[in-house]
Amino acid sequence: MIRALKANGTDQRVLNAMKKVPRHLFLPEDMQSFAYADTPLPIGYDQTISAPHMVAIMCDLLKITEGMTILEIGSGSGYNAAVMAELAGENGKVYTVERIPELVDLARNNLERAGYSNVTVVHDDGSCGLPEHAPYDRIAVTSVAPEVPPPLREQLSKNGIMVIPVGTQYQTLVVVKKDSKGNITHKAMGEVIFVPLIGKYGF
Protein backbone atom coordinates (compact mmCIF):
# COMPACT_ATOMS: atom_id res chain seq x y z
CA MET A 1 0.00 0.00 0.00
CA ILE A 2 2.71 2.48 1.01
CA ARG A 3 4.85 1.63 -2.04
CA ALA A 4 1.91 2.38 -4.33
CA LEU A 5 1.22 5.69 -2.60
CA LYS A 6 4.89 6.65 -2.82
CA ALA A 7 4.86 5.89 -6.54
CA ASN A 8 1.90 8.27 -6.87
CA GLY A 9 3.97 11.11 -5.40
CA THR A 10 2.44 11.26 -1.92
CA ASP A 11 4.30 13.59 0.47
CA GLN A 12 6.77 11.72 2.69
CA ARG A 13 5.24 13.09 5.93
CA VAL A 14 1.86 11.70 4.89
CA LEU A 15 3.44 8.35 4.01
CA ASN A 16 5.15 8.23 7.40
CA ALA A 17 1.88 8.99 9.18
CA MET A 18 0.02 6.30 7.25
CA LYS A 19 2.79 3.78 8.01
CA LYS A 20 2.22 4.35 11.72
CA VAL A 21 -1.56 3.81 11.67
CA PRO A 22 -2.62 0.13 11.76
CA ARG A 23 -5.53 0.33 9.28
CA HIS A 24 -6.74 -3.18 10.15
CA LEU A 25 -7.65 -2.00 13.66
CA PHE A 26 -10.21 0.35 12.11
CA LEU A 27 -12.04 -2.34 10.13
CA PRO A 28 -14.62 -5.00 11.02
CA GLU A 29 -13.01 -8.39 11.62
CA ASP A 30 -14.34 -9.84 8.36
CA MET A 31 -12.73 -6.97 6.40
CA GLN A 32 -9.32 -6.98 8.05
CA SER A 33 -7.71 -9.21 5.43
CA PHE A 34 -8.38 -6.39 2.90
CA ALA A 35 -7.02 -3.66 5.20
CA TYR A 36 -4.03 -2.72 3.04
CA ALA A 37 -5.75 -2.91 -0.34
CA ASP A 38 -6.20 0.47 -2.01
CA THR A 39 -9.98 0.43 -1.96
CA PRO A 40 -12.82 1.79 0.18
CA LEU A 41 -14.32 -0.84 2.48
CA PRO A 42 -17.68 -1.10 4.28
CA ILE A 43 -17.72 -0.43 8.03
CA GLY A 44 -21.49 -0.83 8.53
CA TYR A 45 -24.47 1.56 8.61
CA ASP A 46 -24.06 2.25 4.86
CA GLN A 47 -20.71 3.93 5.50
CA THR A 48 -17.19 3.18 4.27
CA ILE A 49 -13.57 3.67 5.25
CA SER A 50 -11.94 5.71 2.47
CA ALA A 51 -9.42 4.12 0.12
CA PRO A 52 -5.83 4.80 1.24
CA HIS A 53 -5.08 6.82 -1.89
CA MET A 54 -7.97 9.18 -1.09
CA VAL A 55 -6.81 9.60 2.51
CA ALA A 56 -3.34 10.42 1.15
CA ILE A 57 -4.70 12.90 -1.40
CA MET A 58 -6.77 14.74 1.21
CA CYS A 59 -3.91 14.86 3.71
CA ASP A 60 -1.54 16.12 1.00
CA LEU A 61 -3.98 18.91 0.13
CA LEU A 62 -4.55 19.84 3.78
CA LYS A 63 -0.81 20.35 4.44
CA ILE A 64 -1.16 19.53 8.13
CA THR A 65 1.77 20.51 10.34
CA GLU A 66 2.55 19.80 13.97
CA GLY A 67 0.50 21.59 16.60
CA MET A 68 -2.51 22.32 14.39
CA THR A 69 -6.13 22.09 15.48
CA ILE A 70 -8.14 20.04 12.99
CA LEU A 71 -11.85 19.42 12.48
CA GLU A 72 -13.01 16.31 10.67
CA ILE A 73 -16.60 15.85 9.52
CA GLY A 74 -17.50 12.16 9.33
CA SER A 75 -15.54 10.03 11.79
CA GLY A 76 -16.43 6.67 10.28
CA SER A 77 -14.28 4.11 12.07
CA GLY A 78 -11.69 6.72 13.12
CA TYR A 79 -8.94 5.85 10.63
CA ASN A 80 -8.70 9.20 8.87
CA ALA A 81 -8.63 11.02 12.22
CA ALA A 82 -5.75 8.79 13.33
CA VAL A 83 -3.68 9.67 10.25
CA MET A 84 -4.33 13.39 10.79
CA ALA A 85 -3.46 13.01 14.48
CA GLU A 86 -0.08 11.58 13.47
CA LEU A 87 0.51 14.60 11.23
CA ALA A 88 -0.57 17.09 13.91
CA GLY A 89 1.65 15.46 16.53
CA GLU A 90 1.20 15.24 20.28
CA ASN A 91 0.75 19.03 20.54
CA GLY A 92 -1.98 19.01 17.89
CA LYS A 93 -5.66 18.28 18.36
CA VAL A 94 -8.22 16.54 16.16
CA TYR A 95 -11.96 16.91 16.69
CA THR A 96 -14.04 14.52 14.61
CA VAL A 97 -17.84 14.72 14.34
CA GLU A 98 -20.08 11.75 13.53
CA ARG A 99 -23.89 11.63 13.29
CA ILE A 100 -24.35 7.84 13.67
CA PRO A 101 -24.20 6.86 17.37
CA GLU A 102 -22.85 3.36 16.71
CA LEU A 103 -19.98 4.78 14.66
CA VAL A 104 -19.22 7.32 17.39
CA ASP A 105 -18.69 4.42 19.78
CA LEU A 106 -16.74 2.45 17.17
CA ALA A 107 -14.41 5.35 16.37
CA ARG A 108 -13.81 6.09 20.06
CA ASN A 109 -12.99 2.47 20.80
CA ASN A 110 -10.73 2.10 17.76
CA LEU A 111 -8.82 5.31 18.48
CA GLU A 112 -8.39 4.43 22.14
CA ARG A 113 -7.19 0.94 21.27
CA ALA A 114 -4.69 2.37 18.78
CA GLY A 115 -3.42 4.88 21.35
CA TYR A 116 -4.65 8.22 19.97
CA SER A 117 -5.34 10.44 22.97
CA ASN A 118 -5.27 13.69 20.94
CA VAL A 119 -8.51 12.86 19.06
CA THR A 120 -11.97 13.74 20.40
CA VAL A 121 -15.01 12.07 18.79
CA VAL A 122 -18.25 14.07 19.03
CA HIS A 123 -21.80 12.89 18.27
CA ASP A 124 -23.50 15.73 16.36
CA ASP A 125 -24.58 17.10 12.98
CA GLY A 126 -21.25 17.55 11.25
CA SER A 127 -22.69 19.82 8.56
CA CYS A 128 -22.91 22.49 11.30
CA GLY A 129 -19.28 22.01 12.28
CA LEU A 130 -18.23 22.24 15.91
CA PRO A 131 -18.34 25.93 16.89
CA GLU A 132 -17.28 25.44 20.52
CA HIS A 133 -13.69 24.65 19.52
CA ALA A 134 -13.41 26.93 16.45
CA PRO A 135 -11.50 28.27 14.65
CA TYR A 136 -9.74 25.33 13.03
CA ASP A 137 -6.46 25.42 11.13
CA ARG A 138 -7.67 22.61 8.90
CA ILE A 139 -11.08 21.08 8.13
CA ALA A 140 -11.48 17.70 6.41
CA VAL A 141 -14.93 16.60 5.22
CA THR A 142 -15.24 12.91 4.36
CA SER A 143 -18.73 12.98 2.82
CA VAL A 144 -20.12 14.95 -0.10
CA ALA A 145 -22.15 18.13 0.46
CA PRO A 146 -24.39 19.90 -2.08
CA GLU A 147 -22.28 23.02 -1.43
CA VAL A 148 -19.69 24.12 1.11
CA PRO A 149 -21.64 24.49 4.39
CA PRO A 150 -21.50 28.14 5.58
CA PRO A 151 -20.72 27.16 9.21
CA LEU A 152 -17.60 25.32 8.05
CA ARG A 153 -16.37 28.37 6.13
CA GLU A 154 -16.98 30.47 9.24
CA GLN A 155 -15.13 28.03 11.52
CA LEU A 156 -12.04 27.88 9.29
CA SER A 157 -9.23 30.01 10.71
CA LYS A 158 -7.45 32.72 8.76
CA ASN A 159 -4.77 31.10 6.58
CA GLY A 160 -6.74 27.86 7.01
CA ILE A 161 -7.45 25.10 4.50
CA MET A 162 -10.55 22.93 4.10
CA VAL A 163 -10.87 19.92 1.78
CA ILE A 164 -14.42 18.86 0.95
CA PRO A 165 -16.21 16.87 -1.77
CA VAL A 166 -19.02 18.95 -3.29
CA GLY A 167 -21.76 18.11 -5.77
CA THR A 168 -25.06 16.41 -6.45
CA GLN A 169 -25.07 14.34 -9.63
CA TYR A 170 -21.29 14.71 -10.00
CA GLN A 171 -18.86 15.19 -7.13
CA THR A 172 -15.71 17.31 -7.12
CA LEU A 173 -13.02 17.48 -4.46
CA VAL A 174 -12.65 21.15 -3.54
CA VAL A 175 -9.87 22.94 -1.65
CA VAL A 176 -11.19 25.95 0.27
CA LYS A 177 -8.64 28.49 1.51
CA LYS A 178 -9.14 31.50 3.76
CA ASP A 179 -6.42 34.15 3.57
CA SER A 180 -5.11 36.41 6.33
CA LYS A 181 -7.89 38.93 5.63
CA GLY A 182 -10.65 36.33 5.70
CA ASN A 183 -11.15 36.14 1.94
CA ILE A 184 -12.27 32.72 0.65
CA THR A 185 -11.13 30.93 -2.50
CA HIS A 186 -12.23 27.58 -3.94
CA LYS A 187 -10.21 25.29 -6.21
CA ALA A 188 -11.61 22.15 -7.85
CA MET A 189 -9.19 19.21 -7.77
CA GLY A 190 -11.04 16.52 -9.72
CA GLU A 191 -13.95 14.10 -9.60
CA VAL A 192 -14.50 11.83 -6.59
CA ILE A 193 -17.14 9.54 -5.09
CA PHE A 194 -18.13 9.86 -1.43
CA VAL A 195 -21.15 8.95 0.69
CA PRO A 196 -23.56 11.90 1.26
CA LEU A 197 -23.25 14.37 4.12
CA ILE A 198 -26.52 14.15 6.04
CA GLY A 199 -27.58 17.14 8.12
CA LYS A 200 -28.87 20.70 8.16
CA TYR A 201 -26.37 21.86 5.53
CA GLY A 202 -26.06 18.51 3.76
CA PHE A 203 -28.58 16.30 2.01
Curated annotation (Swiss-Prot):
This is Protein-L-isoaspartate O-methyltransferase. It comes from Methanococcoides burtonii (strain DSM 6242 / NBRC 107633 / OCM 468 / ACE-M). PROSITE patterns: PCMT. It catalyses: [protein]-L-isoaspartate + S-adenosyl-L-methionine = [protein]-L-isoaspartate alpha-methyl ester + S-adenosyl-L-homocysteine. GO terms for molecular function: protein-L-isoaspartate (D-aspartate) O-methyltransferase activity. Catalyzes the methyl esterification of L-isoaspartyl residues in peptides and proteins that result from spontaneous decomposition of normal L-aspartyl and L-asparaginyl residues. It plays a role in the repair and/or degradation of damaged proteins. Belongs to the methyltransferase superfamily. L-isoaspartyl/D-aspartyl protein methyltransferase family. The active site is at residue 50. GO terms for biological process: methylation; protein modification process; protein repair.
